[in-house]
């Protein structure tokens, strides 16, 4: 048997906790984005991330690299039916969309689940049935000559900063 170096051990994720704030991702395919979101959860004190089954594997080498060690402190749970799992937590579910209410003019509940969708398709259609509301980060550039959207990891960072700012 060849020699193997163990960098660190991660416990198997157990039961999903129902913390006041839950962050969920739906269909994130870019490993760098997922790793960054894991790092953001760690930074803001969110100890678990709920992932749809079609989200990139959190143990992908690029995810681990982008998380900068936060993968050891944030539990990632992969679930088959994201909407059903979030509903069982008995708190409102909100989704990040391009046409939602501005996070700057909406009171963001500090006991809720917040869902961020895939980079190219957003939140999956079936999950919309579970949403109590939608939020967005408005562009401050006027006219049509502007970026089409934000990177999902950047949007998550802006959102969490605004949420915790109160």
Which positions does each model-derived feature cover?
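A contiguous, low-structure linker/loop signature
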Residues: 1-9
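A generic structural signal for short beta-strands and their flanking turns/coil linkers
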Residues: 4, 70-72, 112
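Structured adenosyl-cofactor binding patch, chiefly the S-adenosyl-L-methionine
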Residues: 8, 42-44, 58-72, 125-166
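RNA substrate-binding interface of SAM-dependent RNA methyltransferases
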Residues: 8-9, 13-99
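N-terminal hydrophobic or amphipathic segments with adjacent small-residue motifs
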Residues: 29, 63, 111, 116, ...
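Active-site/ligand-binding-proximal alpha/beta "capping" segment
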Residues: 94-147
């Amino acid at each position: 048997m060849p020699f193997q170096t163990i960098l660190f051990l991660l416990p198997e994720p157990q039961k999903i906790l129902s913390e006041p704030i839950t962050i969920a991702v739906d269909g994130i395919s870019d490993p760098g984005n997922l790793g960054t979101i894991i790092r953001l959860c760690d930074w803001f004190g969110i100890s678990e991330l709920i992932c749809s089954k079609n989200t990139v594997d959190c143990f992908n080498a690029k995810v681990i690299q982008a998380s900068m060690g936060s993968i050891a402190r944030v539990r990632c749970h992969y679930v088959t039916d994201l909407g059903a799992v979030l509903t069982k937590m008995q708190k409102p579910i909100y989704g990040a969309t391009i046409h939602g209410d501005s996070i700057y003019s909406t009171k963001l509940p500090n006991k809720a689940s917040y869902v961020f969708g895939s980079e190219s398709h957003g939140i999956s259609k079936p999950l919309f049935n579970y949403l109590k509301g939608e939020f967005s980060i408005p562009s401050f550039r006027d006219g049509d000559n502007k970026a089409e959207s934000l990177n999902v990891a950047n949007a998550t960072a802006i959102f969490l900063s605004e949420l915790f700012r109160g």
